[in-house]
Regions:
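Major-groove DNA-recognition helix of helix-turn-helix-type DNA-binding domains
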Residues: 18-46
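Short, structured secondary-structure boundary patches
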Residues: 45-46, 57-59
Length: 59
């Protein structure tokens, strides 16, 4: 992960990019079929945008 070019996106943007709902995204994460989120706070997560984009292309 290159910190200079890494953009973090929140779940609503991931849902918009993938067309999937929150429950389905969490199911894919739990099954190891989706990029893992990063904790950015005690109750907040984000995803690395480049990982999501790569996942979309490969899906």
């Amino acid at each position: 992960m290159n910190n200079q070019n890494t953009r973090l996106i929140r779940l609503p943007e991931v849902m918009n990019k993938t067309g999937y709902g929150k429950a389905w995204i969490y199911r894919l994460i739990n099954e190891g079929l989706f990029p893992k989120p990063i904790k950015i706070g005690t109750r907040a997560i984000a995803f690395i945008e480049s990982e999501i984009d790569e996942w979309i292309v490969s899906a």
